[in-house]
Amino acid sequence: MRLYRDNAVVLRQHKLGEADRIVTLLTRQHGLVRAVAKGVRRTKSKFGARLEPFAHIDVQLYPGRNLDIVTQVQTVDAFATDIVDDYTRYTTACAILETAERLAGEERAPALQLHRLTVGALRAVAEHHRPCELILDAFLLRAMGFAGWAPALDDCARCSAPGPHRAFHVAAGGAVCVQCRPPGAATPSPGVLDLMDALFRGDWASTEQVPEWLRGQASGLVAAHLQWHLERQLRTLPLIERARPHAAVGVEDSVRQDGDRDSTTRTPSSA
């Protein structure tokens, strides 16, 4: 079989034997690829450091039956240098990588848009020109859009009645009108859905003066919407929430609900 070359982001890695590692890559043309990097744990390895998580690389691989084999690596962007020494940046970048892997779909399914989005998000976190929570929420909203899970933020998610609407219900698909509003719908503060829409569209100018408590409400809704569709919580989000207490995933402390059940949670039988 012929060698192939692709642009990739290293999502994660784990040990294999005494000297090798298995790396999970999000590639531009081949989607998720799992490959063996032989000998990279040896001190004299010529490309071991280039295969650390957060790395943006140009990689050459040899197709294998179950796992491909890394034969050559060149660094495109060493994002880890500006990420790993800062807790907030590190946990944000970890959430980006975990989400990218979960939303990439089957192995080798092309994921050009998600790859481009992931590289851009890691670059934004590394450069730190904008708050990490806004970068993460923008990434999550757009990644959900690629997966077909984008929340309705203006028109009603159920009947398409023109908005804006005040209520938000994850199971319904986002913003809902008065007629369609189900029990347990959340009522975020004015401006929360506008912020989410601005992040989805990349309208960064509209996000600059948004207060932190309002960002927290938006973050809670974004995370809850994602986790509803994934049907289980991302491992990395609680780490971010401890650093950013206003953005609790349950959002019950910062968003008013109708009834006894929060629209952003599942019952045990429905998870």
Swiss-Prot record:
Source superkingdom: Bacteria
Protein's GO biological process: DNA recombination; double-strand break repair
GO cellular component: bacterial nucleoid
Entry-linked SUPFAM superfamilies: ArfGap/RecO-like zinc finger, Nucleic acid-binding proteins
Family: Belongs to the RecO family.
Compositionally biased residues, Basic and acidic residues: 253-264
A Pfam family reported for this protein in Swiss-Prot or TrEMBL: RecO_C
Name used for this protein in its record: DNA repair protein RecO
Entry keywords, A to Z: DNA damage, DNA recombination, DNA repair
Function: Involved in DNA repair and RecF pathway recombination.
Region annotation Disordered: where it falls in the sequence: 248-271
Listed PANTHER family: DNA REPAIR PROTEIN RECO (PTHR33991:SF1)
